[in-house]
Amino acid sequence: MEVILLDKVGKLGAIGDKVTVKSGYGRNYLLPQGKAVAATEKNIADFEARRAELEATAAAKISEATARAEKLASLEVTIAANAGTEGRLFGSIGTRDIAEAITAAGVAVAKSEVRLPQGVLREVGQFEIDIQLHAEVVQVVKLVVVAE
């Protein structure tokens, strides 16, 4: 299935790229999310007419994400959790807990923007968490997990 990208998609392309994707990926993700349109003659002409508008919208999203990243740069978040004597948590701290703590600290972050490549946090200590605000904007936030 050939599609025209309306937004930057990681590992696929940028705005205006005409790419070939598997049909299921196109129908179930790219098209419903508004990230692409099918590459028909009409859609190609419509895209070329709206290209400047879409690029301006993308630039606005990047500048908004950069502004949020600047707010997050100086932020240090502390989360208190029940822990045993050796520093192991009873339970874990996941993306939702981190997003709620950052939002409570004053910067709105969705749980889908929090990246934990090693999985959930299960011990007390200091961690550096990646917050991906946009495909091009990633900010590191210092997180301190303390025992209650």
Curated annotation (Swiss-Prot):
Signal peptide: none annotated. The keyword Glycoprotein does not apply. InterPro entries: Ribosomal_bL9 (IPR000244), Ribosomal_bL9/RNase_H1_N (IPR009027), Ribosomal_bL9_bac/chp (IPR020594), Ribosomal_bL9_C (IPR020069), Ribosomal_bL9_C_sf (IPR036791), Ribosomal_bL9_N (IPR020070), Ribosomal_bL9_N_sf (IPR036935). GO terms for molecular function: rRNA binding; structural constituent of ribosome. The keyword Ribosomal protein applies. GO terms for cellular component: ribonucleoprotein complex; ribosome. GO terms for biological process: translation. HAMAP family: Ribosomal_bL9 (MF_00503). This is Large ribosomal subunit protein bL9. It comes from Cellvibrio japonicus (strain Ueda107) (Pseudomonas fluorescens subsp. cellulosa). The gene is rplI.
